[in-house]
Amino acid sequence: MPDSDNESGGPSNAGEYASAREQDRFLPIANVSRIMKRALPANAKISKDAKETVQECVSEFISFITGEASDKCQREKRKTINGDDLLWAMTTLGFEDYIDPLKLYLHKFRELEGEKAIGAAGSGGGGAASSGGSGSGSGSHHHQDASRNNGGYGMYGGGGGMIMMMGQPMYGSPPASSAGYAQPPPPHHHHHQMVMGGKGAYGHGGGGGGGPSPSSGYGRQDRL
């Protein structure tokens, strides 16, 4: 007796696979449902077919707008689609009523991204400042020892806010001092310490705004 479709993995499994591939084109339905519920009273319900309808419409809208923006980038020999390209595409396709609020949103989004980047850079500089401050007390003693011995040298300040205290191990007889004073014999072991701090170590803030990272390419889907 021939196997059924379910047993042989025939049309039934193929249909399920095709349905899964079709769902890959859409936004996750849980996200769509969550957005829809924000516009409804707390006790409102949304049917499954309503969620699926909005899911398909939103996904097609995204493909429609992105495809138009992609054409613009190709004409201008660019590989990265940015927010301004999408706003241009919406205006071209007749969605100009949505442009003003979206421009405000895009401007605010870029401001927040810039503030996040500055805050991250500031927190990193503050950590370097605290570590530099804790090491400066003990480091000053090491620097004094290094200054009294040949081969040791110290650096303070500098444009990048670097504090360096370094001594080199001594081998053989020490060279004569430039001042002509007798030098003590070199120790067998010499301290070697570096304290690195960014500009934040001296109270200077640093940071930079970051724009959206460019994607390596873009795809174009068929539009309705």
Swiss-Prot record:
InterPro entries: CBFA_NFYB_domain, Histone-fold, Transc_fact_NFYB/HAP3, Transcrpt_fac_NFYB/HAP3_CS. One of its GO terms (molecular function) is DNA-binding transcription factor activity, RNA polymerase II-specific. It holds the Pfam family CBFD_NFYB_HMF. Residues 27-33 bind DNA. It comes from the Eukaryota. One of its GO terms (cellular component) is nucleus. Keywords: DNA-binding, Nucleus, Transcription, Transcription regulation. Residues 54-65 are annotated as: Subunit association domain (SAD). SUPFAM superfamilies: Histone-fold. Disulfide bonds: none annotated. Residues 1-22, 121-152, 173-224 are annotated as: Disordered. Residues 213-224 have a biased composition (Low complexity). It is found in: Nucleus. Residues 121-138, 197-212 have a biased composition (Gly residues). One of its GO terms (biological process) is regulation of transcription by RNA polymerase II. Its main location: nucleus. Signal peptide: none annotated. Component of the NF-Y/HAP transcription factor complex. Heterotrimeric transcription factor composed of three components, NF-YA, NF-YB and NF-YC. NF-YB and NF-YC must interact and dimerize for NF-YA association and DNA binding. Interacts with NFYC2, NFYC4 and NFYC6. Belongs to the NFYB/HAP3 subunit family. This is Nuclear transcription factor Y subunit B-10. The gene is NFYB10.
